[in-house]
């Protein structure tokens, strides 16, 4: 079935909120929100311009009758260990096959703790 071969793309940019400075070399992870366990959809690092792109397929999120992911992102430091920012409070319910984000992170969240 053609729908089963459909690819989903989440892309966007990450910048410092106060200055608009692109934030490169951060880890971006995409998730599908579910009732029990959230599905990991993929991850990548931002480039020097703060841009990222993650591709995934319906098999990565499909449970029961789910036809579209309930999408959120988590942004980590370059090592992928410290959570800096997440969009879980603004989940994109039934996300489209092509979602674009502009993520603005406060400078205070970027400072090592």
Residue ranges of predicted features:
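Beta-strand-dominated extracellular/periplasmic modules and repeats
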Residues: 2-112
